[in-house]
């Protein structure tokens, strides 16, 4: 159905894959159903046609479809596929007219030239950021691209945008989709800041500090800078904005949809959950890379903190998409309760995750507080095998210092911070239980895990890395 190469008039081949997916802008894999698309959009269109799917749009039928939010509205995604010419009856590349092939060749050449120009323009700070993950320790997240700053997992890259401007990222991986993560190629990203906090010069008031005293060696301006950076990074890397979550709040899975989840095989639902978790983890990795203090840690410690803490941050972020009024969580575009996950065969894990989310919601945390608490959970000096634990500890102390005074500003309850810190053992316990359940599942379904689970998910929760991930 696809033809991935164009023979040039001179020598060699020009890769169609250099042209981004016409639907979502992700790394393309060739011509599918008549249009240059990624594997994710190809699979989405195929499933839609096979199932004669009829989708509805929860908004105004004009949703933006891009790499980040392509899974949010199936209706608008399918309409974009059709509008751009995707069809079961589309001709293959080999049957294109000479004019069509020449036009496609010209577009490939144009993209290749643009990419080459962008590579030549990279220098200074952009180059330093792009090479921060430059060495190779062993495998997985530690096997890192020396050219572009992408984070590898068994040869598959997490595509992480930089904080501003244009960057050319040689990404070995598209964003997670139903089709998995196994892709290679080039992705150009322009990161548009969503939230501008630079004008907030005094995020904290001096009156909120204990007797107006700062910890030794810590300045007010430094705490303010760290807090603004973390909060901005959090807001820009959440899967859903609070406005979107409010719009979706009462869109719950129907009885028929819940029964469909319950009737799935255990392995099918495990795979779906693994894909969703992997998607969430990619946002967490991007969040971490935007934290100034995190990027100043040595590469080894960055990797260890991500491997051991990314799922814990996903669990903290889960409270944003949890409705404590009816005990439901956002899953695949709608809210559903614990009964949706019966087929997993892990009721205790599901119960503990839901209980934690409900308890965290009861603290009524603001986005500022969730941002700072998430970063404090991630940047923990207690992780095993850190090379510079003292440096990690100093950064975490500054984050907690900022969190303490945001809480004092927002809450009458002086015990809120203590309550948050007391929840960290629960976070760790839930994540450890997830690891145990995964290993039990893997023992009975090794082929499913090895062939169908996302590579990043397998790498992060590999039992061989248990000493690191605790």
Swiss-Prot record:
<dbReference type="InterPro" id="IPR003079">
    <property type="entry name" value="ROR_rcpt"/>
</dbReference>
<dbReference type="GO" id="GO:0045892">
    <property type="term" value="P:negative regulation of DNA-templated transcription"/>
</dbReference>
<feature type="DNA-binding region" description="Nuclear receptor">
    <location>
        <begin position="18"/>
        <end position="93"/>
    </location>
</feature>
<dbReference type="GO" id="GO:0009725">
    <property type="term" value="P:response to hormone"/>
</dbReference>
<protein>
    <recommendedName>
        <fullName>Nuclear receptor ROR-beta</fullName>
    </recommendedName>
</protein>
<dbReference type="GO" id="GO:0042752">
    <property type="term" value="P:regulation of circadian rhythm"/>
</dbReference>
<keyword id="KW-0010">Activator</keyword>
<keyword id="KW-0479">Metal-binding</keyword>
<keyword id="KW-0090">Biological rhythms</keyword>
<feature type="domain" description="NR LBD">
    <location>
        <begin position="222"/>
        <end position="460"/>
    </location>
</feature>
<dbReference type="GO" id="GO:0008270">
    <property type="term" value="F:zinc ion binding"/>
</dbReference>
<dbReference type="GO" id="GO:0045893">
    <property type="term" value="P:positive regulation of DNA-templated transcription"/>
</dbReference>
<dbReference type="GO" id="GO:0005634">
    <property type="term" value="C:nucleus"/>
</dbReference>
<keyword id="KW-0862">Zinc</keyword>
<dbReference type="InterPro" id="IPR044101">
    <property type="entry name" value="NR_DBD_ROR"/>
</dbReference>
<dbReference type="GO" id="GO:0008502">
    <property type="term" value="F:melatonin receptor activity"/>
</dbReference>
<feature type="short sequence motif" description="AF-2">
    <location>
        <begin position="456"/>
        <end position="461"/>
    </location>
</feature>
<dbReference type="InterPro" id="IPR013088">
    <property type="entry name" value="Znf_NHR/GATA"/>
</dbReference>
<dbReference type="InterPro" id="IPR000536">
    <property type="entry name" value="Nucl_hrmn_rcpt_lig-bd"/>
</dbReference>
<keyword id="KW-0675">Receptor</keyword>
<dbReference type="GO" id="GO:0043565">
    <property type="term" value="F:sequence-specific DNA binding"/>
</dbReference>
<keyword id="KW-0238">DNA-binding</keyword>
<dbReference type="GO" id="GO:0007601">
    <property type="term" value="P:visual perception"/>
</dbReference>
<dbReference type="InterPro" id="IPR035500">
    <property type="entry name" value="NHR-like_dom_sf"/>
</dbReference>
<dbReference type="GO" id="GO:0060221">
    <property type="term" value="P:retinal rod cell differentiation"/>
</dbReference>
<dbReference type="GO" id="GO:0001228">
    <property type="term" value="F:DNA-binding transcription activator activity, RNA polymerase II-specific"/>
</dbReference>
<keyword id="KW-0539">Nucleus</keyword>
<dbReference type="GO" id="GO:0071300">
    <property type="term" value="P:cellular response to retinoic acid"/>
</dbReference>
<dbReference type="GO" id="GO:0004879">
    <property type="term" value="F:nuclear receptor activity"/>
</dbReference>
<dbReference type="GO" id="GO:0045668">
    <property type="term" value="P:negative regulation of osteoblast differentiation"/>
</dbReference>
<dbReference type="Pfam" id="PF00104">
    <property type="entry name" value="Hormone_recep"/>
</dbReference>
<comment type="function">
    <text>Nuclear receptor that binds DNA as a monomer to ROR response elements (RORE) containing a single core motif half-site 5'-AGGTCA-3' preceded by a short A-T-rich sequence. Considered to have intrinsic transcriptional activity, have some natural ligands such as all-trans retinoic acid (ATRA) and other retinoids which act as inverse agonists repressing the transcriptional activity. Required for normal postnatal development of rod and cone photoreceptor cells. Modulates rod photoreceptors differentiation at least by inducing the transcription factor NRL-mediated pathway.</text>
</comment>
<keyword id="KW-0716">Sensory transduction</keyword>
<dbReference type="GO" id="GO:0042462">
    <property type="term" value="P:eye photoreceptor cell development"/>
</dbReference>
<dbReference type="GO" id="GO:0045944">
    <property type="term" value="P:positive regulation of transcription by RNA polymerase II"/>
</dbReference>
<dbReference type="GO" id="GO:0046548">
    <property type="term" value="P:retinal rod cell development"/>
</dbReference>
<dbReference type="GO" id="GO:0007623">
    <property type="term" value="P:circadian rhythm"/>
</dbReference>
<dbReference type="InterPro" id="IPR001628">
    <property type="entry name" value="Znf_hrmn_rcpt"/>
</dbReference>
<dbReference type="Pfam" id="PF00105">
    <property type="entry name" value="zf-C4"/>
</dbReference>
<dbReference type="InterPro" id="IPR001723">
    <property type="entry name" value="Nuclear_hrmn_rcpt"/>
</dbReference>
<keyword id="KW-0804">Transcription</keyword>
<dbReference type="GO" id="GO:0003700">
    <property type="term" value="F:DNA-binding transcription factor activity"/>
</dbReference>
């Amino acid at each position: 159905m696809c033809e991935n190469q164009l023979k040039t008039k001179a020598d060699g081949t020009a890769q169609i894959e250099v042209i981004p997916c016409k639907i979502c802008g992700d790394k393309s894999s060739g011509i599918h159903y008549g249009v240059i698309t990624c594997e994710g959009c190809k699979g989405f269109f195929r499933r839609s046609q096979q199932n004669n799917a009829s989708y509805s749009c929860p908004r105004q039928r004009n949703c933006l479809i891009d790499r980040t939010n392509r899974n949010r509205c199936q209706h608008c995604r399918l309409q974009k596929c059709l509008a751009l010419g995707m069809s079961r009856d589309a001709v293959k590349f080999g049957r294109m007219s000479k004019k069509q092939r020449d036009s496609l060749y010209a577009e490939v050449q144009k993209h290749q030239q643009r990419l080459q120009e962008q590579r030549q323009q990279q220098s200074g700070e952009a180059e330093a950021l792009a090479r921060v993950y430059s060495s190779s320790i062993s495998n997985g997240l530690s096997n890192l691209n020396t050219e572009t700053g992408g984070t590898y997992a068994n040869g598959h890259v997490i595509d992480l945008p930089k904080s501003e401007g244009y960057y050319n990222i040689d990404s070995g991986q598209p964003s997670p989709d139903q089709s998995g993560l196994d892709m290679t190629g080039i992705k150009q990203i322009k990161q548009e800041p969503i939230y501008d906090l630079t004008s907030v010069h005094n995020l904290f008031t001096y009156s909120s500090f204990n007797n107006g005293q700062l910890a030794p060696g810590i300045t007010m301006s430094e705490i303010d800078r760290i807090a603004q950076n973390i909060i901005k990074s959090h807001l820009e890397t959440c899967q859903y904005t609070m406005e979107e979550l409010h719009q979706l709040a009462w869109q719950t899975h129907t009885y028929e949809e819940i029964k469909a989840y319950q009737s799935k095989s255990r392995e099918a639902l495990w795979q779906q959950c693994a894909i969703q978790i992997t998607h969430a983890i990619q946002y967490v990795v991007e969040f971490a890379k935007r934290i100034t203090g995190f990027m100043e840690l040595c590469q080894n410690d960055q990797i260890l903190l991500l491997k051991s803490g990314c799922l814990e941050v996903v669990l903290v972020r889960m409270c944003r998409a949890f409705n404590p009024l009816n005990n439901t969580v956002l899953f695949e575009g709608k809210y559903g309760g614990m009964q949706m996950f019966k087929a997993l065969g892990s009721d205790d894990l599901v119960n503990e995750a839901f209980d934690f989310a409900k308890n965290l919601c009861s603290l009524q945390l603001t986005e500022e507080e969730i941002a700072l608490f998430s970063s404090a959970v991630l940047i923990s000096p207690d992780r095993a095998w850190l090379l510079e634990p003292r440096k990690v500890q100093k950064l975490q102390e500054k984050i907690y210092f900022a969190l303490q005074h945001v809480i004092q500003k927002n809450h009458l309850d002086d015990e809120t911070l203590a309550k948050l810190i007391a929840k960290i053992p629960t976070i760790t316990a839930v994540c450890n239980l997830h690891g145990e359940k995964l290993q039990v599942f893997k023992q009975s379904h090794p082929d499913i895990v090895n062939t169908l689970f996302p590579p990043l998910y397998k790498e992060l929760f590999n039992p061989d890395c248990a000493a690191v991930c605790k």
